[in-house]
Amino acid sequence: MGVPEPLVEAADALEDLPARVGERDWGRMLPAARKDWYVDCNWKVYVDNYLEGYHIPFVHPSLHRELDYARYRTETRRLYSIQHAPLRAEASRLPAPAAASDDGAQFYWLFPNLMLNVYADNYSTNLIVPLGPERTLTVFEWYFADPEDEGVRRRVAETVEFSDEIQIEDIHVCEAVQRGLRSRAYGRGRYSVKRENGVHHFHGLLHGYMNEQ
C-alpha cells in the first residue's frame, strides 16, 4: 500500500496553492480558539461530507442563507481542492469580503486529511484524525488578528458558535451515513457532476495511493 507524500515533499504537486493563500496577511493571525470533536464514523465519510456541497441547502439552513449557492463551485487540483463560496448581499453571520468580486469563503482540502477554511477576517484549520474504522477525531483551530482585543474576542465567540451549529449538523449526517454503510440495502450511486466533483477527486487520489505498488 502506498504512503501519501509528506507535505513538504509534495510542494510541487501543490502548484499554486502557496501563492493563493499567500495573498493573505497571515503574519498577523494568532491562535484564538480550539475545539475537538469525536465522530462515530470513518474518517473518509467525514472528508466526503466536507467536500460535497450538495447537502448544504438541506442540512445547513443557516449556512445556506449566508451563501450565494448558485455560484458555489469546487475547483480540483492535483493534491488539493477549493470550494469557492460567494456570499449573499444580505449575509449577516459571515464577514463580507474586501471586494464584491471576492469569495466570501474558500474551503481548501489538502489530501488526505487537512482542511483550511479562509474567511475575510479569520481562518481555521480542521485536522481529521482516524481513531478506528468507525471513529474519527476532528481538531478545529481558529486564527484571528489581535485575538485579545475585546471586539475580536466577541467575533471569535460568534465564529465558533456558528461553526458549532454546522458541525453538529454534519455529525448527525456523517453518523447516519456510517450506519447506512453497514446496511445490506446499501448500494453505490452516481456522482453529481456539479456538486460532488471534489468527492470524486478525493476517491481517485485515495484509490491511486491504496493501489500503488
Task: Give a label for each model feature.
Residues M1-Q213:
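C-terminal catalytic domain of Rieske-type non-heme iron oxygenases
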